[in-house]
A protein has these predicted regions:
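Active-site and donor-binding regions of nucleotide-sugar-utilizing enzymes
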Residues: 17-220, 227
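Short, intrinsically disordered, charge-balanced linker/junction segments flanking boundaries
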Residues: 229-233
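Membrane-interacting alpha-helical segments
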Residues: 1-8, 12-22
Length: 233
């Protein structure tokens, strides 16, 4: 199934390549976005986090980055010595991260989920943990993390009914993805039920609420901090 998935991903990439080239010519900053998305991250862009046991937190766009902000603040407060990497997919998400997450040691565009790209980026960064926000689970990236025994914790997890139907088509891959995640921190009991029905281990599922509404960046309890520290090693 991975072969079929990768053939589809590579085919889709070449189909949209002319559009990417056009945007690179016409849109300021898009060349950097594509360079990083294809794994061409410069050493100086990740020197503060690469091979230093960083915490890698990923949010696709503006909404996910807003949800990421209070989490980053609490991690920085609890573990100031650990570098933090934040990644985003969209230009809006990237710009928002630079505006509201000054605590991050590095901010990059997320690598495309092509096997050679994911493998290269994970090998260069080697985070201590990867924390995708909401439903940002990508097969090749998770596979590269799993092969290096790097834990994955989903935060602010959200699964829609439409997503449930879509993920069921990823048989042979979806089970691997779920088994790679060591903890599912879901927004609601409904989201928890969805991820459970999709095959996640119930003992790994927690309902933690939606961090997007955590506007005051409330203090976490000592028990929460101890659990985070244990999970992060």
């Amino acid at each position: 199934m991975y072969i079929i998935y990768n053939l589809l991903m590579i085919g889709a990439f070449f189909l949209v390549m002319p559009y990417f080239i056009y945007r690179s010519i016409c849109e300021k900053g898009f060349t950097r976005r594509m360079r990083q998305s294809l794994g061409g991250i410069r050493d100086e862009e990740i020197e503060s986090v690469a091979l230093k046991g960083c915490i890698w937190i990923h949010g696709a766009s503006v909404g996910e980055i807003v949800a990421t902000s209070p989490l980053v603040k609490e991690i920085r407060k609890a573990m100031p010595e650990i570098p933090i990497l934040v990644s985003a997919v969209t230009v809006g998400g990237y710009d928002m991260a630079r505006q509201i997450i000054p605590e991050a040691d590095a901010i990059i565009y997320f690598p495309l989920d092509l096997p050679f790209v994911s493998e290269s980026v994970v090998k260069r960064i080697r985070p201590r943990i990867f924390m995708p926000v909401e439903t940002e689970l990508w097969p090749n990236l998770l596979r590269a993390l799993r092969e290096r025994n790097i834990p994955v914790m989903m935060v602010n997890g959200r699964i829609s009914e439409k997503s449930v139907k879509t993920y069921r088509y990823l048989y042979g891959i979806w089970d691997d993805m779920l088994n790679t995640v060591s903890r599912f921190c879901m927004q609601s009991s409904i989201d928890a039920d969805y991820i459970r029905h999709l095959g996640a281990d119930p003992s790994k599922i927690y309902v933690t609420g939606n961090t997007k509404f955590d506007q005051t960046y409330a203090e976490v309890t000592q028990e929460d901090l101890d659990n985070y520290k244990k999970e992060l090693g």
